[in-house]
Structure formats: C-alpha cells, structure tokens
C-alpha cells in the first residue's frame, strides 16, 4: 500500500460527517452488481485530513466482534477484466468459510463484506514500478456496517497496477524470480496474497490498530505484512491449486 505522508500537524484539519447510507457511496457501483443486501446498512464516518496525512489508528469504536450473520453473497462482476474476476473469486472462496484466514480478518461475514467493497473500488491503471501489485492512496473514510458488524476504511484511490504482477503475464527473467511471501510473484497464489494484504490495511484488529500497518515506500515492512497474512492464510492459499 502506498500513501503520501507530507504536511504538518499544524496544517492538519478534520471534518467528520456521519451518514446513514442506503448504499455505500464511497465507491462507484457501475462496474459490478450484487444481489446481496450487505451494503444496505453502512454507517459512514468520513474523516478528511490535509492532503497526504492520515489517521494512524482506527476510530475508538471501530474494533468490534462480527455478529453471527450470513456471509454476503458474491459479487456478479460485469467487467470484461477476467483477471480481476478470477482474483476476486479466488479470495472470496478463501474467506467465505470460517477458517484461520477469515478469522484473522474478523470472521467470514466481515471479511467478505470488506472484500466486496474493495473489489468494487479498485481500478486497473499503470503505475511506475512493475513490482507493485496494488496502491491505495489519498484520504479515506471510516465505515461501519450494521448487518455484518464490519468496521473498516476505504481510501480515495485503489489502483491495481496494469504493469505489475497482477496483470503482467510475461515478466522479465529477473522479475519472475521475485516472490510474495513464499509464492513466485506472478502465480495465482501470490496474487491472492497481494489482495489479502490490501484487505489487511482496511480492517482493525483486536488491539485497536489496523491489522497491517501502513507500508507505502517501505519494502521491508511490506514484506513483513505479507508474511503476517501468509501465516494465517497459507493453507487456504495453497488450496487454490486444487
């Protein structure tokens, strides 16, 4: 995840809005449709900060235990982006059941709800580096869903790098030798781990911090964050081959 950190505390400003929304208004809904009602009860707390600044931790009331509710139905993506669709299906199948991976993200219902919102939001665009899979940047909003119990954040921009490992089918030799966790960078498993990594930046943990700390511009921290997700999700990621 990449996010600018410029600006000073003196310049920082906050504007907080509480909106009971009939639908999640923070991300375009034209690219995908779903029969799920899980986006019908979102409480959106919008925190606007000076450009380049962001809150270091979730809101005080963001960390909640997800209630025992049905897992949201999968999105029916209308995009022609087959890679995005297959990646979404892989990660949905990882998170839809109660297992070590979905529990890390707060339970299947919570994890799938936020995965759906992230998938609706991210767009395919080129970035400078061929090694970056996703980039999240800009201001973000804090959201609480009343049905699933999911509290999470969404950034202004979430980009899937069209020049990066998610989409590049013909990597150069040196690039092909790189890995995400234990998985070679252009494999199905690595792509799933990359999307799960981004999900970890959006959800709070039981300690009151984001599951994964911001790692924009810090390659070592990014690798550590991927290893954290891998520790909880490796069995489910490996099962994608079966």
What is each PLM-predicted segment?
Residues 8-17:
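Bacterial N-terminal signal peptides that target proteins for export
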């Amino acid at each position: 995840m990449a996010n600018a950190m410029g600006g000073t505390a003196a310049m920082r400003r906050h504007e907080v809005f509480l909106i009971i929304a009939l639908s999640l208004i923070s991300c375009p809904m034209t690219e995908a449709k779903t029969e799920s009602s899980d986006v019908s009860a979102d409480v959106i707390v919008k925190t606007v900060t000076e450009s380049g600044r962001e809150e270091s931790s979730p809101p005080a009331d963001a960390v909640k235990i997800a209630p025992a509710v049905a897992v949201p139905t999968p999105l029916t993506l209308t995009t022609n982006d087959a890679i995005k669709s297959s990646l979404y299906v892989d990660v949905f199948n990882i998170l839809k059941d109660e297992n070590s991976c979905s529990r890390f993200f707060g339970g299947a219902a919570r994890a799938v709800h936020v995965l759906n919102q992230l998938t609706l939001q991210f767009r395919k665009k080129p970035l400078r580096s061929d090694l970056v899979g996703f980039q999240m940047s800009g201001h973000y909003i804090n959201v609480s869903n009343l049905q699933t119990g999911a509290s999470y954040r969404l950034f202004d921009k979430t980009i899937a790098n069209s020049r990066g490992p998610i989409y590049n089918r013909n990597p150069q030799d040196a690039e092909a030798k790189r890995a995400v966790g234990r998985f070679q960078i252009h494999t199905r498993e690595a792509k799933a781990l990359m999307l799960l990594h981004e999900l970890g930046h959006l959800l709070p943990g039981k300690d009151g911090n984001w599951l994964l700390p911001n790692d924009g511009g810090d390659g070592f921290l990014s690798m550590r964050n991927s290893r954290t997700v891998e520790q909880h999700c490796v069995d489910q990621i490996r099962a994608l081959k079966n």
